[in-house]
Amino acid sequence: MSGRGKQGGKARAKAKTRSSRAGLQFPVGRVHRLLRKGNYSERVGAGAPVYLAAVLEYLTAEILELAGNAARDNKKTRIIPRHLQLAIRNDEELNKLLGRVTIAQGGVLPNIQAVLLPKKTESHHKPKGK
C-alpha cells in the first residue's frame, strides 16, 4: 500500500481571483502583468494593480453612464461613438481629462455663435391708424 488514497490531506480551496477579492470587474491580474511588462519600474507592489484597476473601472463606469444617458436622449438603445463624444464633452471634468483625445466618428458639439443668431426684435406691430 502506497497510502495515496483520497482519505488523507485537505481538499484544495477553490481559487479566488484578485478581482473578486477586491470586488472589481476589471482584471487585477492582467493589470499587474501589464505593469510588470511595461518597464514602469523594477518592482510592482501588490496593491498597485488593485488600485489602478479600480480607477479604470470607475472611469469606465462614469463614461458609460453618461453615454447611456446620451443614447437614451436620442431614443437609441445602443451606444455609438457619437454618444461617447457628447457624454465626455458635456462633462467639465471628463472634458478636461480627455481634452486632447480624438474620438473616431464622434462628431462635434452643436454650437452656434451668438453673433450669428438672428436678432430678436419686438413683434409689437401696431396697426397704422387713420
Curated annotation (Swiss-Prot):
Cross-link (Glycyl lysine isopeptide (Lys-Gly) (interchain with G-Cter in ubiquitin)): 120
A Pfam cross-reference name: Histone
Key word Acetylation present: yes
Domain of life: Eukaryota
Keyword set, alphabetical order: Acetylation, Chromosome, Citrullination, DNA-binding, Hydroxylation, Isopeptide bond, Methylation, Nucleosome core, Nucleus, Phosphoprotein, Ubl conjugation
Molecular function, one GO term: DNA binding
Residues modified to N6-lactoyllysine: 10
Modification sites for N6-(2-hydroxyisobutyryl)lysine: 6, 10, 37, 75-76, 96, 119
SUPFAM superfamilies the UniProt entry points to: Histone-fold
Positions where N6-crotonyllysine occurs in the chain: 37, 119-120, 126
Subunit record text: The nucleosome is a histone octamer containing two molecules each of H2A, H2B, H3 and H4 assembled in one H3-H4 heterotetramer and two H2A-H2B heterodimers. The octamer wraps approximately 147 bp of DNA.
Database matches in PANTHER family: HISTONE H2A
Function summary: Core component of nucleosome. Nucleosomes wrap and compact DNA into chromatin, limiting DNA accessibility to the cellular machineries which require DNA as a template. Histones thereby play a central role in transcription regulation, DNA repair, DNA replication and chromosomal stability. DNA accessibility is regulated via a complex set of post-translational modifications of histones, also called histone code, and nucleosome remodeling.
Name of the protein described by the UniProt record: Histone H2A type 1-F
Organism per entry: Mus musculus
